[in-house]
Design a protein with these regions (language model features):
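A short beta-loop-alpha structural element at the N-terminal edge
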Residues: 6-20
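A short helix-loop-beta-strand connector motif used in the catalytic cores of GNAT acetyltransferases and
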Residues: 48-61, 88
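Conserved acetyl-CoA binding element of GNAT-fold acetyltransferases
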Residues: 84-96
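Conserved acetyl-CoA-binding loop-helix of GNAT-fold acetyltransferases
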Residues: 94, 100-113, 140
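Conserved GNAT acetyl-CoA-binding A-motif
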Residues: 116-126
Length: 161
């Protein structure tokens, strides 16, 4: 039986689930030596900052057979010199045992659709230097390493040439 996969925009009712996913992302990042602090957000902050009158970021949720198994958290940027918007991907996560099943690609392709709607020239993000599996995944999508900060790669996925 094939799984039903859906990627949708998160809404205010998803704030608790987003908080849970952010916790999973922090655990994963700790394992990759990409984060060593404590999470200081909470459901109320997520509701105010993602779903208030002026959202500071947006989230896509990955659902498989109706169960949320991942998310992408992003915000828009604008270059005055280029006159172009772009997207900064803050977080991308597929929960533990559900990785390597193509779900990350589903999230990234949904994010690419969002980029197209906003006429974004590209999507950018960074990744832990130790997460080489993710580096390979991003390159397979067509993203390129735009620059390095020490050992940390910064990726750029162009939406058009």
């Amino acid at each position: 039986m094939e799984n039903r996969v859906n990627v949708r925009k998160a809404n205010k009712k998803d704030s608790g689930k987003l908080l849970e996913l952010i916790g999973y992302k922090a655990e994963f990042d700790r394992s990759m030596k990409g984060f060593n602090g404590e999470i200081s957000t909470n459901k109320g902050k997520i509701e105010r900052t993602l779903f208030g009158d002026v959202p500071f970021a947006h989230a896509l949720l990955l659902e498989v057979d109706g169960k949320v198994l991942g998310f992408a958290l992003f915000h828009y940027r604008y270059s005055s010199f280029r006159g172009e918007p772009s997207i900064w991907l803050d977080d991308l996560l597929v929960v533990g045992r559900h990785r390597s099943k193509g779900y990350g690609a589903e999230l990234m392709h949904a994010l690419k659709i969002e980029a197209g709607k906003s006429l974004a020239s590209h999507i950018s993000w960074t990744a832990s230097p130790y997460n080489t599996k993710a580096h390979n995944f991003y390159k397979k999508l067509g993203a390129e390493v735009e620059r390095m900060d020490g050992q940390r790669p910064y990726f750029r996925w162009a939406m058009y040439d």
